[in-house]
Swiss-Prot record:
It is found in: Cytoplasm. Keywords: Cytoplasm, Methyltransferase, rRNA processing, S-adenosyl-L-methionine, Transferase. The keyword Magnesium does not apply. The gene is rlmH. Homodimer. Transmembrane segments: none annotated. Specifically methylates the pseudouridine at position 1915 (m3Psi1915) in 23S rRNA. This is Ribosomal RNA large subunit methyltransferase H.
Length: 160
């Protein structure tokens, strides 16, 4: 199963990008041994439309163009479901074992995600009720993906 992160907005050079790349590389090392075929990251430019509804619609269209049929769509949203790391790992493992071709994680821009896109998701995931900058959400998501792989592998990184 291939994992994909689609994020509205680009990470500039700096500590967030370095940390994101570190977790991605760590996942690649352990993920392949677990039957994951890699982790792709696609950055979508933020819409420059004047109103939020138009911005979200334009960003949703760009996201939809990158979402393959048959994959498990996971949106990140403050109204989503909070799951612990073990449950997140178990869900990724189930999708892998069910031969789901890919899991696609979507991080919205400053205005969030279009409600229609959130409704299409198999899982709407939250990192709590707080609002986080999209740069931090990307790092947090990549860390959780790496952590999930270590849980599935029985690696000591996760000590719960």
């Amino acid at each position: 199963m291939r994992l994909t992160v689609i994020a509205v907005g680009k990470l500039k050079q700096g500590p967030e990008r370095e940390l994101a790349e570190r977790y991605r590389a760590r996942f690649d090392d352990i993920g392949r041994k677990l039957g994951f075929r890699g982790l792709d990251i696609h950055e979508i430019s933020e819409s420059r439309a004047r109103d939020a509804a138009t911005r979200m619609a334009e960003e949703a269209a760009a996201i939809a163009a990158l979402v393959p049929d048959g994959g498990a769509l996971v949106t990140l949203d403050e109204r989503g479901k909070s799951v612990d790391s073990a449950a997140f790992a178990a869900q990724l493992g189930r999708w892998r074992d069910e031969s789901v071709p890919g899991t696609i994680f979507v991080i919205g821009g400053a205005d969030g995600l279009l409600p229609e896109l959130r409704r299409k998701a198999k899982l709407c995931l939250s990192f709590g009720a707080a609002t986080w900058p999209h740069q931090m959400v990307r790092v947090m998501l990549l860390e959780q993906i790496y952590r999930a792989a270590t849980i599935l592998a029985g690696h000591p990184y996760h000590r719960a």
